[in-house]
Amino acid sequence: NYIEKGASEGAALEMDGRNINLQGFENGNFIGPTIFNNVSTDMTIYKEEIFGPVLSVVNLDHFDDAMNIINNHEFGNGTSIYTSNGTLARNFMKNVQIGMVGINVPIPVPMAFYSFGGWKGSIFGGHGMHGEEGINFYTKRKTITSRWPEDVAGTSLNMPTMK
């Protein structure tokens, strides 16, 4: 369990979603919002990609350090930065190697019609799962060129035209 692993490795469990009780679904298997703070790059919850309502916060003193750990990570699904500095935000947007980027938002997931997906080890094959890429993934395109003249007589190597 990632929540137990994060806590045992020393991350500060700020919000624990393990004991959530949803009225009408008492026997369900749910995890509520979970937030870890003071996560370091040697922790399992940093190294592995966790899907679900689990957020890991890595606090760093220098912008370049943040860019390095993000861009050197094997996964690249989503990341966020909190700043009031527009120059840093633009630098982050331009240079971070991540598929979904948030500026002053906790989870950089827009509406479902946008392509979902990250870069590097976070991508689902060659396509995202939402938006135009998702439609193209589930669509098999075929191009058919056809001509049905009334009389076909002789041989012609000319491209047919509409006359």
Give the predicted meaning of each segment:
Residues 23-163:
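Conserved C-terminal structural/oligomerization subdomain of aldehyde/semialdehyde dehydrogenase
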Residues 2-3:
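Alpha-helical packing segments of well-folded alpha/beta enzyme cores
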Residues 13-23:
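Cytochrome P450 fold signature focused on the C-terminal beta-domain
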